[in-house]
Regions:
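N-terminal/edge-of-domain interface segments
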Residues: 1-131
Length: 131
C-alpha cells in the first residue's frame, strides 16, 4: 500500500465481492476493533443465491486476545497524530467463518458495528481470504 492510502475497511454493513472457488472450507478475516471489542453477524452469500450468517468478533487493538480471539500479529507501539510513538502493544486478530465447501462464495456482508456498540467503537478489516 502506498503511504497515506486506505489500507482497511470499517465494518459498516457493506457487501464485499469475493472471488471464490468451490471447495473452500473457511473464510478468514484479519481485523481489530478500536475503543472496545466488537462483533456482529456476517453474512456469506454463495453463487447459487443461498446464504449463511455467522458471528464475527474482534478485540480492541490495544488489548491482548480475549473471548477466543487469535493474536495474528502485534506491534510494540502506535503512531500518534503528533508524530510521536505511543509505547503500547497493539494487536491485529484473526477470526474465521466455516463455509459450505460444496458451494462457491460470491460475497460477504459485514456487520453493522456502529448500530450495535457506542458510536466510538469501530472494527477495521485488513484482509479477507478463503481457505
Amino acid at each position: 500500500m502506498p503511504s497515506c492510502q486506505p489500507d482497511n475497511i470499517l465494518a459498516a454493513g457493506q457487501k464485499i465481492l469475493v472471488h471464490g472457488t468451490a471447495g473452500a472450507t473457511t473464510l478468514g478475516f484479519l481485523g481489530s476493533s478500536g475503543n472496545g471489542s466488537a462483533g456482529g453477524p456476517v453474512t456469506v452469500t454463495y453463487t447459487d443465491g443461498t446464504s449463511q450468517t455467522s458471528q464475527l468478533y474482534f478485540g480492541d487493538w490495544a488489548q491482548s486476545a480475549s473471548n477466543g480471539d487469535i493474536n495474528a500479529l502485534s506491534m510494540p507501539y502506535r503512531n500518534s497524530q503528533g508524530g510521536t510513538n505511543q509505547q503500547i502493544t497493539m494487536y491485529v486478530f484473526a477470526d474465521e467463518v466455516q463455509l459450505d465447501s460444496s458451494k462457491t462464495v460470491a460475497s460477504v456482508t459485514m456487520p453493522m458495528i456502529a448500530d450495535q456498540i457506542s458510536s466510538n467503537t469501530s472494527t477495521h478489516i485488513f484482509a479477507i481470504g478463503l481457505k
